[in-house]
């Protein structure tokens, strides 16, 4: 795990220490193990830990519909475990991020995750362009959204799409 991801995992862990009822702290820890841009494989222990953290987040009663959707995206990834490829896990997550960003069109973070997982599952430059357009749409709404900028770069990072 990179230093930045380790730091993120540590900070989310500090958040759940400070507030054990902060469901997003558990979800955040689970998400630090998922790396769709470089698609490293997880082992059985990592899948189990991610699912455990996700289930902990889901067990906290006072969560919003938005949070429940975020937890659902992590759950579909982790629940498949080693019986699915990483790509299949990302496809499952992408489906949930599609649902979430459609049902909550003002949620720029859901749109950013949608763009991220579309990049991860892209089979063609057309698919990457769709992901890039999602990221550009975020920037139309919120010009300083870091995910929007980050995923525009990754989506269009091919010789044919570079000028977009």
What are these regions (language model features)?
Residues 1-11, 71, 75-86:
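Alpha-helical segment of the N-proximal tetratricopeptide repeat
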Residues 5-15, 49-60, 89-104, 127-142, ...:
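Amphipathic alpha-helices of TPR/Sel1-like and other helical repeat/solenoid scaffolds
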Residues 21-37, 62-82, 105-123, 142-159:
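Amphipathic alpha-helical repeat scaffolds of TPR domains
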Residues 2, 39-45, 82-88, 123-126:
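Short coil/turn and helix-start
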Residues 7-67:
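Post-signal peptide N-terminal segment of secreted/secretory-pathway proteins
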């Amino acid at each position: 795990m990179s230093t930045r991801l380790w730091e993120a995992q540590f900070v989310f862990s500090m958040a759940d220490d400070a507030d054990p009822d902060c469901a997003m702290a558990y979800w955040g820890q689970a998400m630090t193990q998922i790396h769709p841009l470089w698609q490293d494989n997880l082992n059985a222990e990592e899948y189990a830990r991610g699912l455990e953290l996700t289930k902990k987040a889901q067990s906290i009663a006072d969560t919003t519909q938005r949070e429940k959707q975020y937890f659902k995206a992590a759950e579909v990834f982790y629940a498949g475990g080693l019986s699915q490829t990483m790509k299949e896990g990302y496809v499952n997550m992408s489906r949930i991020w599609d649902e979430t960003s459609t049902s909550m069109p003002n949620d720029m973070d859901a749109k950013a995750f949608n763009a991220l997982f579309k990049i991860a599952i892209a089979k063609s430059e057309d698919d990457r362009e769709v992901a890039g357009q999602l990221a550009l749409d975020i920037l139309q709404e919120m010009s300083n959204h870091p995910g929007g900028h980050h995923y525009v770069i990754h989506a269009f990072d091919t010789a044919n799409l570079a000028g977009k």
